[in-house]
């Protein structure tokens, strides 16, 4: 694993199937079936790749592993999915959702982050480079001291990004 500081998205100016862009995610879909991507790197990804929230939502619906019904921020019923990682190619870019929390309003859990990183390790060698943000520490509210030992087990083709002066 290599640590870098800066903006992860600056590495993705043109689509590249050999570089996997990993973002941290929750498992909640809105009433239109779109993955809720309203904060942090997920929001940045949603803004950079319009329609990706619907694309991931459709993928989760096809996967059909609804864990529980939940009430979203606007009091509408939605579904929460447990998926660990979900990947594909969107508009020419290899991209992966790494689940760090079940519901967007809750903090990340160390167990889910660990489980998702283990699943990620199973697929990283299919890519020249794998770029991800430090999982679970921003909006996930987990201490960096608990996450670092997990990400340090990632292979050297994995680049873990933090914004300068954050982690």
What are these regions (language model features)?
Residues 1-167:
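Macrodomain-like recognition of ADP-ribose-binding/processing modules
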């Amino acid at each position: 694993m290599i640590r870098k500081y800066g903006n992860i998205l600056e590495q993705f100016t043109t689509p590249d199937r050999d570089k996997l862009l990993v973002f941290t995610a929750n498992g909640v879909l809105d009433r239109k079936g779109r993955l809720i991507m309203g904060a942090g790197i997920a929001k940045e990804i949603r803004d950079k790749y319009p329609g990706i929230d619907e694309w991931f939502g459709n993928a989760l619906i096809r996967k059909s592993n609804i864990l529980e019904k939940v009430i979203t921020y606007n009091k509408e019923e939605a579904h929460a999915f447990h998926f660990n990682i979900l990947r594909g190619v969107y508009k020419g870019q290899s991209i992966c959702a790494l689940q760090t929390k079940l519901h967007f309003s809750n903090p990340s859990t160390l167990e889910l982050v660990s489980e998702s990183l283990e699943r990620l390790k199973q697929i990283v060698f299919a890519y020249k480079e794998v770029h991800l943000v430090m999982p679970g520490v921003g909006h996930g509210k987990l201490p960096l001291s608990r996450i670092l030992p997990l990400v340090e087990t990632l292979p050297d083709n994995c680049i873990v990004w933090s914004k300068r002066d954050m982690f």
